[in-house]
Amino acid sequence: MKEYEVIRKSDNETIDIVFGYSKGDAFKRSGYEPENYDLVGGWYAD
């Protein structure tokens, strides 16, 4: 799985850390909407 930071687009604040096999998978698992949030990272987590 990869680790992503959840960034709120309105103020570019990092608000959460989520995990997923891809960016799309991480969005599904997190429940955040891509319209309002961005995921950055993609680091491999142990």
For each of these PLM feature ranges, what is it?
Residues 12-22, 41:
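A short, exposed loop/beta-hairpin motif centered on an aromatic-Gly-Thr core
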Residues 31-46:
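Short, mixed-charge low-complexity intrinsically disordered segments
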Residues 1-13:
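Short aromatic-glycine-(Arg/Gly/Cys) micro-motifs in beta-strand/loop hairpins
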Residues 4, 24-25:
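General helical secondary-structure elements
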